[in-house]
Amino acid sequence: PSHDSALWTGAYVASQAYRYRVTGSPEAKANLIRSVQGLMTLMEITGDRRTFARTLRAATGNPPSPWYPGTGLYAALEWKEGGNNDMFKGVMFGLAHAHALLCEYPTGNDQLCARIRFNVTQIADNLSVAQPSGQNRLAAQWLAAYVTRNFSYLLRATAEWTVQAPILSQGNVTVVYQDGVADWSGTHLAFVEYMMFSLLAERYPLPGIDAGSTLRHGI
């Protein structure tokens, strides 16, 4: 497996959401559902809500560190430690697009949508990379507000927005170094983050805030 699976799978979920909206392809919808289930497994398999797995693979029987055996429902899998800021971006991007496509209105995916809501709230409440003030916290609280319509999450997201908006309005200032070499990893992560925030601003605006204008300026 790719050691950056969480990030790339989130981007793939978004691509299949876009594809489905344009074409109505059943294959795109099936791809999205299968892939977002993988993202949620990253959250669930570790047994510790403060962390998440970086990637998964089929069980080998005796995994060396940093791989660990799954248990219970996930006994057929192994997971790799190291879920971090970069991988978090992919998880959030994928969950946001899956909820927007499948869960805003009845689509016959009630069980999957309940699982999405559970994982999103666990991220907002417990995941270590989403607790300190910063854009990860903004993403977690805003997505939780969107999927649950819970006012407490909305208040926390709005408060965090006021802190992060000046930074977001300036864009990703690390994409070019002084010698002119682009930071392609940083560019991609910034793009994923701005796309996710733009989706949230469209689907669940923060009260009294024109987040879209700030994000467009940053982009």
Model-derived segments and their meaning:
Residues 1, 22, 35, 117-219:
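Catalytic domains of carbohydrate-active enzymes that cleave complex glycans
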Residues 1-29, 34-37:
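N-terminal carbohydrate-binding/catalytic regions of secreted carbohydrate-active enzymes
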Residues 2, 27-135, 174-176:
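Extended ligand-binding groove/face enriched in aromatic
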Residues 4-8, 83, 183:
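Hydrophobic alpha-helical segments of membrane proteins, primarily the transmembrane helices
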Residues 8, 87, 190:
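Residues that flank catalytic or metal-binding motifs in active/ligand-binding sites
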Residues 11-25, 75-79, 90-108, 137-152, ...:
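Well-ordered alpha-helical scaffold segments within catalytic/enzyme domains
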